């Protein structure tokens, strides 16, 4: 098959990372073109087998940027004559549909967040319109969980659950606190609780709740935590004022130097390998690829569970502790359990690695190949 994958950038985003991973995996057996903005930073490794094409004009933002992208994408469609196009996130899915008018190219739209929201972070009207109305334009819409498929019901043409693929090779357990990576290098865990996400999205990521929970843990186990050297480290890019807000909260809660903000990091694998515990504190989360990545490197995971979505990641395996979103007390209790009980922590770490293998690209790309073949065959009938 000839496949064109369209995304707005190849940096600073989980969905964008998934788009690149999908392009790389499909390019092993198919002709794949990645249409994107090559003028921006490239954060993710792109296979030499993937043809990369720029479709964005040198305009930073606005209507002209997107109309220019539509024009260039249509030219690319005419030139390449793809069997199918995949849009990464709603805007790129939409421009695929507009650019392909009259060309008979089926479009698969990919959604990367939840189709419902908590009252504390309601879905905007524009987002709801995109998810439940614009998505009716597409041959297929992929979602990340069965929970989202249930929310959608029969409102769209066809909905398929497609988990995000894992980009990392799972580690192996060598001893109680000793692990080995895919290259055979051993690493040991440190007394670190790691969290990751864009700091400007602190409310969505629940970093305020995480800091409140951390304060509770420190208050209850201060001597033990200080003796063992436990720290909370938050990795993530800051573009506006997320960092300053969170730093002020650290001061208010008197957390001192027990919390570190690491900024955007390209060495996330090393951070996962160093961390004994990974915390996902989101108020809502469509999937949580960072959770799977952390599991693969032997982190004992503590996660909020937004209406069953993160429970789907853990499956039936005992590989992490779940708690309700926006509940600092429950999050604190879970963190305290894995930090103070080494036997529990090691069991969760071992099981997490095994569960992460379900999300390996080979498994996910087979599901994608089957879906794309069905979409192409249906359009040719």
PLM region spans:
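Short hydrophobic beta-strand element within catalytic cores of glycosyltransferases
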Residues: 300-304
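N-terminal strand-loop element at the rim of the active site
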Residues: 5-13, 17-21, 25-65, 148-153, ...
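A short, well-ordered alpha-helix in the C-terminal region of glycosyltransferases
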Residues: 330, 337, 344-358, 370
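Conserved acidic donor-binding segment of nucleotide-sugar-dependent glycosyltransferases
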Residues: 316-328, 337-342
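Aromatic "clamp/platform" in nucleotide-sugar-dependent glycosyltransferases that forms part
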Residues: 264, 283
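Short His-centered aromatic/hydrophobic patch
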Residues: 87-93, 111
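Conserved donor-binding/catalytic core segment of Leloir-type glycosyltransferases
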Residues: 4, 186-205, 211-214
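Donor nucleotide-sugar binding/catalytic pocket of nucleotide-sugar-dependent glycosyltransferases
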Residues: 53, 136-174
